[in-house]
Amino acid sequence: MRQLVFRSLAALVCLGVLSLSQSSAATKPNQPDKPNLSGAWVLDLQASTSLDPLMTQIGAGFLDRKYAAHTKLKATLQQTADVLTIAARGPGFTFNQTLYLDGRTDPSSKQLLGATALKTRTAWSEDQKHLVEKHHIRTRQGKEGQLTIKRSLIEQGKAVEAVMILKLDEEPTPTSARQIWRKQV
């Protein structure tokens, strides 16, 4: 049971943490138009919307959903031109992930909010302002669909908004949630 809670938290981290920006939203010389996501960040639970509807649709259990709703996470991100490495921590859990930012499709078996990501593609938006991560997922009930995470700098680079949209193949209406990550001081 505890492992399920940790997997759900890992999904929470994957969804929001990846969006974090460096303290000043500076760019690296080899990425003149892209935000630098490197830095230390803290999830602002008060400013974020509930992940409960999204996690419920995926099939996450009650305890997983409640644990994710009340756990304050911290994350450290390290970005290069092609890779974003995430190390997230919370009470009793650790999550590490590497995202390839060049648009390639990466086969995966990561647990995201109770679903399994079958493959992941991460790339910058056309305007180079948003990091867009698309996961082809399978829920615990065997349904397939797409979980899209769009991250944008807000508050002059002092926070990142991560908007998550879940669209299951067999369901007409998408479900969404939003996380706000604040620069750690």
Regions found by a protein language model. Name each.
Residues 1-10:
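Bacterial N-terminal signal peptides that target proteins for export
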Residues 10-18:
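Hydrophobic helical h-region of N-terminal Sec-dependent signal peptides
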Residues 20-25:
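Sec/Tat signal peptide C-region and signal peptidase I cleavage site
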